[in-house]
Amino acid sequence: MGNYDFTKQPSLLIQGAMDTETAYLIEHLEEHACITIGNWKFHTGFLGTKREPVIISKTFQGIVNAAAATSLALAYFKPWAVINQGIGGGHDKKFHRGDIVLGEKIVPMGAVAYAFSKEGAGIDAKGFSPLPVEIFCRETGKTKKVTEYPCDIRLLQVAEQVETKYHTGRGVIGSGDEWN
C-alpha cells in the first residue's frame, strides 16, 4: 500500500492528548510517515492484521488544542471517523483502572451554571446545571443549543464487538479543561 494517499482515501483518525496515549500506536504503524501541520504532527500508516489505514495525532492537553488538531486533520486528511482516546479520571464505580469506557455521549464539563448563592456562602458543587453550548447543525443549516453530543451508534456497536482482555462498558465522556 505504498501509494496510499491519506489525503484522498478513507482512513481512521485516532487522537490522544499525551505521548502515553499515542506512542504505542505510533510505534506499531507499518509504513509510518509523519506530516507536520502547524504545531501538530500527524502520523500515517497501517495498523493490525487487516492493515487499517490510520492517522494518529497527539493533540496536547486541553479542549482548544484538541479542537485545533481535529480541525486540521479533518481539513487535510478527511478521515471517515475520529476516535479520541486517552487516560481519564473515572467517576463511575463500575469502572476501574485499565477499563475501557465506550462513549455513548460527550458532555462539556466546563459549560455549567451554578445556582446563585449569597456573598461568602461559596459554591455548592452539586448545585449546578449544564449550560447549553451553541453549535452549527449541518442538517438544518442553523445553529442550535446542546448540552451533550451523541456518539455514532454504529461505531459504538462495532467497538463493543472487539474482543479484548479488558473490561469494557458504555458510559458518558466528560470533556473539559479540568483535571483531578
Predicted regions and their residues:
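Short Gly/aromatic-enriched secondary-structure transition segments
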Residues: 28-32
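Glycine-rich phosphate- or other oxyanion-binding loops that anchor nucleotides, phosphorylated ligands
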Residues: 4-8, 36-180
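Gly/serine-rich nucleotide phosphate-binding loop at the start of the catalytic core
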Residues: 9-25
